[in-house]
UniProtKB/Swiss-Prot annotation:
GO terms for biological process: translation. One of its GO terms (molecular function) is RNA binding. Belongs to the universal ribosomal protein uS9 family. The lineage of its organism: Bacteria, Pseudomonadati, Pseudomonadota, Gammaproteobacteria, Alteromonadales. This is Small ribosomal subunit protein uS9.
């Protein structure tokens, strides 16, 4: 591995992303596939690109990602978090900008567990008065 490589771990819901960034031409590879192939949804692709567009490094860095667990939205959020951490490792002066956009904070929301006697986490069975 090259010495000019920057690493960041990102997490969201049940997804974990390992992000490696190095100086390049703007390629983003997710699980050995291009970003456009891996994510079918345009919104997921936008979420992944957000931190790079914010600091105007879309064409300056090559991003290589391995991501596990969760669904499309969770994985996209995890990759965004990982890219943000890699950018901060690259240049610490980017931290205030990324923090203001809300990319540095780990979104701690998790799925609430299903409770006994209920249909879902909070949905109760239908109540019949008579």
């Amino acid at each position: 591995m090259a010495a000019t490589q920057y690493y960041g771990t990102g997490r969201r819901k049940t997804s974990t992303a390992r992000v490696f960034a190095k100086v390049g031409s703007g390629n983003i590879i997710v699980n050995k596939r291009p970003l456009d192939v891996y994510f079918g949804r345009e919104t997921a692709r936008m979420v992944v690109r957000q931190p790079l567009e914010l600091v105007e490094m879309t064409e300056k860095l090559d991003i290589y990602v391995t991501v596990k667990g969760g669904g499309i939205t969770g994985q996209a959020g995890a990759i965004r978090h990982g890219i943000t951490r890699a950018l901060m490792e690259l240049d610490e002066s980017l931290r205030p900008t990324l923090r203001a956009a809300g990319f540095v904070t780990r979104d701690a929301r998790q799925v609430e567990r299903k409770k006994v006697g209920l249909r879902k986490a909070r949905r109760r069975p239908q109540f019949s008065k008579r």
